[in-house]
A protein has these predicted regions:
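Short catalytic/metal-binding and nucleic-acid-binding patches
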Residues: 1-146
């Protein structure tokens, strides 16, 4: 029996979390992170999805997105598949890179939007991972300013 399709609303904002399988690292080098970011940018532009913030931790990723509609599943599928193929080829491995299905939470208020944005930005700082701080580069079409 297949899984139920997720229902999304175009006007809604979502906090998406993608985890490494068995808590394994998703990124070993900055070049891995840059490739993931370039692909995120490519697919969000292609599918007309807004990215408000994101954070690449060693073994998981946070992305705050809007205008997802039915394209959020397509975005994650394209992103996860293409990155896993790159990663497996580069590091001479096989099998699943990501742990099961991605998680997504509806961000249903301005206050929660602020809370999630703060969490995403502070996540690497709290984990003492200064080298992978939330990167505010060309992918951010919009940013939230207090």
């Amino acid at each position: 029996m297949g899984r139920k399709a997720r229902l999304y609303c175009e006007s809604q904002v979502y906090h998406v979390i993608m985890r490494g399988n068995n808590k394994q690292n998703l990124f070993y080098e900055d070049s891995d992170r840059y490739l993931f970011i370039r692909r995120l940018k490519k697919y969000t532009e292609e599918l007309q999805i807004d990215v408000y913030s994101y954070c690449l931790m060693s073994n998981h990723v946070h992305i705050l997105i809007g205008k997802a509609n039915m394209n959020m599943s397509k975005l994650i599928q394209k992103l996860a598949t293409s990155y896993a193929m790159y990663f497996n080829r580069k590091y001479e491995r096989s099998g699943h890179l990501f742990q099961g299905r991605y998680k997504s939470e509806t961000v249903d208020s301005d206050e929660y939007f602020k809370t999630v944005t703060r969490y995403i930005i502070q996540n690497p700082i709290k984990a003492n991972l200064e080298d992978i701080r939330n990167r505010k580069d060309e992918i951010l079409k919009k940013s939230y300013e207090d």
